Each structure stands twice: as C-alpha cells, then as structure tokens.
Amino acid sequence: MAEHRIKDICNSNARSVKGLNKDIEIQYLETSDLTCGECSNLQPILLKNAPSRAQRLLSSDTIVYSMVRPNLCHYGYFENPPQNLVVSTGFLTLNLKPQYIGIIDPHFVYLLLTQPWLTQYLHTIAQNAVSSYPSLNPSDVECLCFEFPDFEIQRRFADLFFKIDRKIALNREINRNLEAMARQLYD
C-alpha cells in the first residue's frame, strides 16, 4: 500500500470562470443544492448575473467538497459534468493530477473523503474555525493522508459502491414517480 496526501495526488480549485465570456449561460450549483452526491437544484443563469461566489468551473472526474458545515454532507462526484457547470467558492474542487491516472482511482478518493468518521473529524475542525459558522480551509482537506491499495483493488471497490449509489438514486426516482402518480389518482 502506498500512502499519499490529497494535495500530492490532486489539484485543488484548478479551473475557474476567469476569462470566460460573461454573457454565457452557466449551470450554477450552490453548496446547499448538493447533499451526499445528489443535486437538488441546478440554476441556469447568465455568468454576468451569477453570484460573485460562482467561480469554480468543473471538469470530468471532479470531487466537490463543501468547506462550510461539513456535517451537512454537501459533497459530490462529477464524472461527466455539463461543460458550463459552475459551483460556489464554498466548495473545494479536487481533480486527480495527470501523473496519478492509473495509479489512484478518483472514485476511490471520493469514497475516502466521504466516510462518516472523516466527515465528523472535519466537522470538529470546522467548529474550531475563527468564523461565525463552522468552516474549513482547503488545507484541512489537502493535508489528509490515506493509504491506497493496488489500483485494481481501488477500482473494484469504488465500482461496487458507485453501482450501489446509482441503484439507490434510481430507487429514489422510482419512489418520487410513484408518489406523483398516487397524488394524481387521489387528488
């Protein structure tokens, strides 16, 4: 097993909207609109009308992790996000460095960062922050150190958990549709 710090294997906040045409439409994601990997609201808005915190542009295989109130689990993994997806500066974005592709699985990194014990640990750090609300610094996440098994083991493990997550999401969608159908029948 190899031991790596997040900052050694990932680039943080690598892409921003700086230099983009301000008249383009973006899909904006606020921290409260993402919980445990599930988006509840993407806001289409012109970049020039977006909140000043709409700065972080996503690319493929991006991990987003809220720096505010980590106990609320505002984090997610974006495998193939829309080209114009922008998230709040309240998120830390992490992308695997090119030299670690095929050595570290980004899905596995996401699974490590979203473990309940780690969420609690980061929340404890956030509560001690010198601000009016519990918040983290990017370095609090970047300095985390993990042991990584062989790439194939990481990939299999992450694949299994992501399949389970997709099945859970599908079941939730089916339940929402069934609930809507029941309302139509009884209203």
Please report, for each region that a protein language model flagged, where it lies by residue.
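Short, ligand-facing micro-motifs at secondary-structure edges
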Residues: 30-44, 70-89, 121-124, 131
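Non-catalytic DNA-recognition/assembly elements of restriction-modification systems
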Residues: 1-18, 147-187
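Short coil/turn segments at secondary-structure boundaries
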Residues: 19-27, 123-126
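Short, positively charged
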Residues: 104-140
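A short beta-sheet element
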Residues: 54-56, 60-118
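Sequence-specific dsDNA recognition surfaces
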Residues: 5-19, 27-66
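A short glycine-rich beta-alpha junction/loop motif
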Residues: 85-91, 128-158
